[in-house]
UniProtKB/Swiss-Prot annotation:
GO biological process: regulation of translational fidelity; tRNA threonylcarbamoyladenosine modification
Protein name: Threonylcarbamoyl-AMP synthase
Subcellular location field: Cytoplasm
Pfam families hit by this protein: Sua5_yciO_yrdC (PF01300)
Functional description taken from the UniProt entry: Required for the formation of a threonylcarbamoyl group on adenosine at position 37 (t(6)A37) in tRNAs that read codons beginning with adenine. Catalyzes the conversion of L-threonine, HCO(3)(-)/CO(2) and ATP to give threonylcarbamoyl-AMP (TC-AMP) as the acyladenylate intermediate, with the release of diphosphate.
Coiled coil location: none
HAMAP family reported in the protein's UniProt record: TsaC
EC number, as in UniProt: 2.7.7.87
Organism field: Shewanella denitrificans (strain OS217 / ATCC BAA-1090 / DSM 15013)
Family annotation (Gene3D superfamilies): DHBP synthase
Boundaries of every YrdC-like domain copy: 3-188
GO cellular component, one term: cytoplasm
InterPro entries assigned: DHBP_synth_RibB-like_a/b_dom, Sua5-like_dom, TC-AMP_synthase, TC-AMP_synthase_SUA5
Major location (coarse): cytoplasm
């Protein structure tokens, strides 16, 4: 497995690779959201059923526009999400019909976050798009908190580890339904 900086890993992602990278609270697994084969590989590595869907993380809301159906949201709903970003808040928003079901699962919505973590932001900026994001762990197990554990648990399963530090969040992000305002998971 390659160990790279956030700026060096862009070609790996562009070629369909799956990476591990530090986020605000835990290590994440990620790939290109427009590459179904990469998403399938990520789901296989994590042993996660496609039906559950995945999160997109971005450096700006503009990067999420190809995926989110903003026409189904009010200005107040959008303003509320923007008031929490960048930061540890994930919003479940209506998804555009062309978005792969491998990414959105069985839902007519998709979970999205604009990250404040500098490495996540660098990754998304270098790709010029969001990154698929899910916690780096096998389904049902605790998330990975160290690069050493990534190297042990995922050595022959992923293509690269992005070097860097986790953020200061003790818990994963809060998840909010953008349409109803309902908190689906309390985070930090």
């Amino acid at each position: 497995m390659l160990q790279l900086s956030s700026t060096q890993v862009t070609p790996v992602i562009a070629q369909g690779g799956v990476i591990a990278y530090p986020t605000e609270a835990v290590y994440g697994l990620g790939c290109d959201p427009d590459n179904d084969q990469a998403i399938e590989k990520l789901l296989a590595v994590k042993q996660r059923p496609w039906q559950k869907g995945l999160i997109l993380v971005a450096s700006s809301f503009e990067q999420l526009l190809p995926y989110v159906d903003v026409a189904q949201l009010t200005q107040a709903q959008l303003d509320f999400a923007h008031s929490k970003w960048p930061g540890p808040f994930t919003f479940v928003m209506p998804v555009k019909s062309h978005v792969s079901n491998k990414l959105r699962g069985e839902f007519d919505s998709i979970a999205v976050r604009v990250s404040a973590h500098p490495i996540v932001r660098e990754l998304c900026d270098s790709l010029n798009k969001p990154l698929v994001s899910t916690s780096a762990n096998l389904a049902g197990q605790d998330p990975v908190l160290t690069s050493r554990q990534i190297l042990t648990d995922f050595a022959d399963k992923i293509d690269a580890l992005v070097l860097g530090d986790l953020g200061q969040q003790a818990q994963p992000s809060t998840i909010i339904d953008a349409r109803s305002g309902l908190v689906l998971r309390n985070g930090q």
